[in-house]
C-alpha cells in the first residue's frame, strides 16, 4: 500500500501545488479502499483531512468513520471538567493580542454557560499558549493540559490558573511541553 502525506491545499506548498484531493483519491475510482489517519487527533476534525473526506463524498465514495482515539475526547474524559457541556474551538489566533482576547472571551463563555472550552495548538507554540493562559486567565479558572495523549509520555494535569502560575512561572520553566501534541481545556 502506498502512503501519501496531505497537509491541506493551502499547506501543501512544500510538496508542490500538484497535490490535490482528487489526485490522492484516484485509487478510490479504481475500486480500492482507502484510509485517512491523523497524527494526534481525529481525521477531519480540526484537520486538513476534511478536504479529502469532502472530495470523497463528491466522488460518490462511501465514507465510513472508524472507532479510534480522539485526543480531544480523551482530554475531556481525563480532565475532570464538565463533560455535559463543552465546545471545541479548534486553533486559537496566533497573534498575541488576538489570542489573549480570545482566551478572555472563552473564559467568559465558560463561566456563563458552565461549559468546558477545548482547543488545540501547533506543538511548537505550546509554551506560548500556556503562558498566555497563565498571564490572562483568572486565578480560580481550571485549565487542563492533555499532553502526548495515548503515548507512554502522556501527561494529563488539571490545575487552577493560580497553581499553573506556581508550577510554570516563566516560559523557560515549561520548555518540557514544547513540541508535544497538547489539548487545552478550560472551565471557569
Model region roles, listed by residue range:
Residues 1-64:
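Class I S-adenosyl-L-methionine
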Residues 4, 54, 79-84, 136, ...:
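Short, hinge-like loop/turn segments at secondary-structure boundaries
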Residues 22, 47, 75-77, 98-101, ...:
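Short, well-ordered secondary-structure micro-motifs
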Residues 47, 51-109:
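Class I SAM-dependent methyltransferase SAM-binding "motif I" and its flanking Rossmann-like core
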